[in-house]
């Protein structure tokens, strides 16, 4: 079987259940609906008394519960039970091409592979083949290590992005797979998750074609320093950083395995998606600041971002101006009892958020406390920031006193890789790849710790 070591990829040995009912077996990524226990209760009802990946994961809504450790032990036992009781078909060495249609009518294409954690680095200014897209919060790794370290099975919700405008890797794999291979699964996903189909990718012809596409993509994504930036982590940054940390810990405890290219702990199962896939939406995550002087903020950002400001008459006009730009920002706030709209125009060439967030962080460090008087009395309160999905919510918040909503421009796919290559991982909450119910669902499994 062909190897793809130089591209940081390995053909995984994939496990699929014998009687695959996608609607009860597959579960949405554990880092979704973190404030919505009701969603996970509904998921439990959907999967009740049936084999399900829900029994193999710990939704992050429960990460701080007192019985977390008991839940992790139960997950391990369930994994062992599924392996012993013949829930799975025999493992098969293959890639899988998938098509995911969401409830929003979008179809996203993906390729399931294993990646070599030796070729991945989450730390800033990495020159690794596989790099993080957003700043990794180190404190989030240890609790996730407790779940992965020693687990008999791995389930992927990580999505890697490939910079492939010619659609050579994922899309071409799909054309060939659908033409000549059996369909592995097809069905609905629970709770409005849409539907999913998967095809085997394993013939020599397919492997040869994938190798050629990776060679071309490597050449096209070679940076000025000579490093190759082949894949960016789109979803699951902290999960992949956790997998890397577990592998580093394992090497320390088992130094004889440090160079073992067959050790399953060295790899992570992921889905590769083309950043240019029309079914993959990139939405900006907007900002809102509380308890600050809006005019002082705009003046400060205008200086730091070397821009110019323009008064805008209506909400619609401001929204359209920002939406049709890649580097302009919209502000909405109350002034003399009326809602005001201001456009900040800049000539930023990289992704706009990579310049805005550091400037906001600087402003918040020095922003004076606001003097507020209400029925509770008078007091000083400090400035705060929050991250908002959707422009409607920004304009609603902009109607509140002492509040400034900031609209961010669309995330430009064509400058995404270049920005990360030049500036390192993006600031926190930079972009969102679709809605919560569009995130990857757990479906395929792989043996991890024996």
Predicted regions and their residues:
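Non-catalytic terminal and connector segments of soluble metabolic enzymes
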Residues: 347-350
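Catalytic or ion-translocation cores adjacent to nucleophile or general acid/base/metal-coordination motifs
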Residues: 235-303
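Charged substrate- and nucleic-acid-binding regions of tRNA-handling and nucleotidyl-transfer enzymes
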Residues: 352-450
């Amino acid at each position: 079987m062909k190897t793809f070591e130089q591209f940081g990829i390995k053909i995984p040995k994939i496990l699929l259940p014998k009687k695959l009912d996608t609607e009860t077996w597959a579960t949405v990524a554990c880092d979704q609906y973190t404030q919505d226990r009701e969603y996970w209760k509904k998921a439990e009802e959907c999967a009740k008394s049936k084999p399900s990946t829900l029994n193999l994961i710990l939704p992050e809504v429960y990460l701080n519960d007192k019985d977390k450790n008991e839940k992790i032990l139960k997950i391990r036992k369930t994994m062992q039970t599924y392996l012993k009781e013949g829930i799975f078909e025999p493992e098969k060495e293959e890639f899988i091409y998938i098509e995911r249609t969401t409830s929003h009518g979008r179809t996203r294409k993906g390729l399931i592979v294993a990646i070599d954690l030796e070729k991945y680095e989450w730390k800033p200014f990495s020159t690794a083949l596989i790099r993080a897209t957003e700043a990794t919060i180190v404190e989030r790794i240890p609790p996730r290590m407790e779940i992965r370290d020693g687990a008999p099975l791995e389930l992927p919700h990580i999505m890697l992005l490939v910079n492939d405008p010619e659609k050579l890797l994922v899309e071409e794999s799909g054309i060939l797979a659908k033409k000549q291979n059996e369909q592995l699964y097809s069905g609905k996903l629970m709770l409005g998750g849409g539907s999913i189909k998967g095809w085997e990718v394993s013939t020599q012809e397919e492997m040869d074609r994938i190798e050629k596409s990776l060679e071309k993509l490597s050449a096209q994504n070679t940076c000025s320093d000579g490093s190759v930036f082949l894949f960016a982590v789109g979803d699951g940054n902290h999960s992949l950083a956790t997998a890397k940390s577990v592998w580093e810990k394992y090497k320390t405890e088992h130094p004889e395995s440090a160079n073992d290219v067959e050790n399953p702990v060295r790899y992570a199962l992921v889905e590769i998606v083309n950043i240019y896939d029309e079914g993959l939406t990139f939405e900006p995550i907007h900002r809102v600041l509380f308890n600050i002087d809006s005019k002082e903020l705009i003046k400060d950002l205008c200086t730091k971002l070397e821009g110019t400001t323009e008064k805008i008459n209506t909400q619609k006009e401001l929204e359209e101006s920002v939406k049709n730009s890649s580097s302009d920002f919209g502000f909405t706030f109350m002034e003399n009892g009326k809602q005001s709209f201001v456009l900040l125009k800049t000539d930023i060439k990289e992704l706009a958020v990579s310049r805005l967030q550091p400037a906001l962080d600087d402003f918040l460090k020095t922003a004076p406390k606001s003097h507020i008087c209400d029925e509770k009395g008078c007091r000083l309160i400090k400035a705060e920031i929050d991250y908002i999905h959707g422009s409607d919510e920004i304009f609603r918040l902009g109607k509140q006193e002492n509040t400034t909503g900031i609209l961010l421009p669309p995330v430009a796919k064509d400058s995404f890789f270049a920005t990360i290559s030049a500036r390192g991982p993006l600031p926190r909450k930079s972009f969102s790849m679709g809605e919560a119910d569009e995130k990857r669902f757990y479906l395929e499994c792989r043996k991890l710790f024996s």
